[in-house]
């Protein structure tokens, strides 16, 4: 079956006379770092021209590039034996592409320590991928919710692709602009716990998301619900320095066990941090 389309330039085969040439032109003109497909539910990849486009992209690129997982329905040999009731068809995204993608989903499904695959969470600040003029404080992520979500994604080894919903004039709605400024302020003070970090077991547990520096010399704990005393499932060396990133002030700690008998440390937060309306981040020297 051919895709027929009419328009300024009539074509008989939409994929091979229009889609593939347009993709090639785009790749040649803009030299993208990523091709982000979004067609994994309609047709098989071969019918959509996905393989031809991917091959061209990889072959002409003179830098590291990546393609996501949504390049078409799976071929029989690709999906054979991969799906059960517990692993439905959408799990094909976890076994293909340079990175797989998740929409408004549960990040706990997106990491497997034994078989990790790069992944990306995709969502808007609001609950829609388009502009909703009715968005208000109840329909968009609060700054606290966003920071906790972002920390959880990074702690699970993921990237966040955040959509900003422009209005009909191409402007950022005020409520979303406010969120971006608040998020930016938090990251300016606590970004060390987010950027260029790696996942740190136990990833996210009991409201705390864990990351670490690339060289492993420092671990980070992002606490979504601050209080005066926090248990962290980390085992720093004796005398290690723990510091609040926002204020650069040291905090007191001691070895302890939680109610399950799991080893870790008990941390005392100062009053200002304990009463914070936003998550707080700690750095923990591990070496």
Name what the model sees in each region.
Residues 1-287:
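Mature catalytic domains of secreted/periplasmic carbohydrate-active enzymes
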